[in-house]
Amino acid sequence: MTKILLIKTGAAGDVVRTTVLLNALQGSITWVIDSRYEPILPTRHPNLHRVVALDHAQATLEHEIFDHTISLEEDVTCALLASKIPTKKITGIYLENKRLVYTNDAAGWYDMSLVSALGAVAANEVKKQNTLTFQQLLLNMFGLSFNGEPYCIYRNNQIKAEQRIIGIETRVGARWPNKGWSGYPALINKLQQLGYTCRLLEQRNNISEYLDDIAGCAFLISGDTLAMHVAMAYHIPSIAIFNCTSPAEIYDYGTLRKIISPQLNQAFYKTHFSQAVIDSISVEEVYAAFLQHTAINSLQKA
């Protein structure tokens, strides 16, 4: 069996979407991850041999030889690890003359990244023009086609969705403030008038508790965030608002409806906050998308 070293430490949403590799690759995978996000990974999977915290990875793995190292972090520490652990082949990011570089088979993805060999301006333009999903770009690194392989993450099967509960994630990370949306309060009011209970997702003591909160929802509304990816992993119907990040990269798995800001091109991956951007999608548009979602009939009958 092919012995694979997979280095993908964060962020949480990126870890979720990278789990498609568990279902797409054949081999014995050792996954190096930030210990904060380890609870996201499934407790068991036939291709997931073990999970190693990044802090202990060098000492744990330095005497092993891998058939294939997959290095997916644009980070010096992770690239150094990928360069040091003995392997027969590497795909992705590694260090060369103290610089982050990437292998040719990973260029489809990393040409659009912060470490792009094309330079920042060209990389952003390539990303803007891209029509492939992350899953397609990821599997292309290995000469594979994406055939709808699902995410595979932790789930507490004792938790069942409550049919009138709508999860709402209003929070966004500091890096992309324009992922936010100003219409949540008004939307929540409209949904409550229909008899739904809106569950505002909050910071939890650990990430598994946060995932459990989502698992108890019958529907989810958010920006392009971890919650969106978890909803798709759990087959929870959802709506996601795209103000500044690429909607093309997100495969919808038949459960996600995307609402795209008319200011997307102007705000594309901009890191400075713009009130006009987070105001650019109307409450009526999101409300209508909710009512038109194919899953709503089953919710209304509950």
Where do the language-model regions lie?
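Catalytic machinery of carbohydrate-active enzymes
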Residues: 1-302
